[in-house]
Amino acid sequence: MYLIYLDESGNSGGNLTDPNQPVFVLCALIVSEQKWQAVERALAVAVDTSWPHPRPDDFEIHASELINPKTEYFRAFPPAHRLAFMSAWLTIAADHELKLVFRAIVKQRFSRWLVHTFGTGVMINPHIAALALVSQVINSHLRNISGATLGIFISDENQQVARDVDKAIRLLRGADGAMRLTQIIEKGFFIESHKSLVLQLCDLCAYVVRRHEEGRVGRPLKPVDSTLWSLVEPLIALGDERLRDVVGWLESEQKKERPGA
C-alpha cells in the first residue's frame, strides 16, 4: 500500500488572470506504508533540530513562510538557516526514495482553452484538471511496482475543491477503459495540514515546482529557487498523463452537467 499525499501551490480560485500567480501546480508525494513512520520520524527530528521551543501554537511548516516569513517566529531566523532546513527536508525525501508526481497548469492558457471549448461562463478549477492528469501517472506508477500495489489519496483540507476532488476520484475509479484508476482504493481523504509532516513536505515540493514552472514562463527566479529545484528534480517520477483522454473526459463531464449547452 502507498500513501499518496496531494497539495497545491498557486491556487487563485476562479481568477485565472492573476499576473502574480500565473501557474497552478498540483503535487503528489508517493510514500510506501513501510517507510511512512520512518519518514515522519526523520521529518520530526529535523523540525526539532531547526526550530527550538517555545514555538507558536499554530506552528506549521509552510514553504512560503520559510521563503518570505510574515510571522515573528520565522523572521527571527536568517535566510541561510531556513534554506538549510528546507534542504534537509528534501534530502529526507530522497533518502527514503519518495517519488513526486506533479502537473503544472499555466492559468491563462487554461482559461483560453475553457473559452474555446465551452464558451464564456464555464469554470473548471485547475485543481481538478491537474488531479485527473496526475492520477493517471500515479496509477501507472503503482501498477508497474512489483505486485501491482494499491494507493490511497490524502489531500490537504481545502473546502474550495474538496467536493469536486472527491467526485473526480470517484468518477475516475469507475471510468471505463484506460483512464480507470485501478490501483486507487476508497475515496479521497482530507486532513488538516498541520497534523501531517508529510503533507507539509508536499507543500514544500509544490512550492519549489511552482517557482520552477514560473521561471519557464518568464517570471524572475532567485538563487534559492535553483538550489531547491536541484533537490526536488531527482524525486520526480514521469509517466503518461493520457492528456488527450483526460481532456475528453473533462469535456464529457462538463457536458453532463450542462445538458443541451
Where are each of the predicted segments found?
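Phosphate-ester processing/binding pockets and catalytic centers
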Residues: 1-261
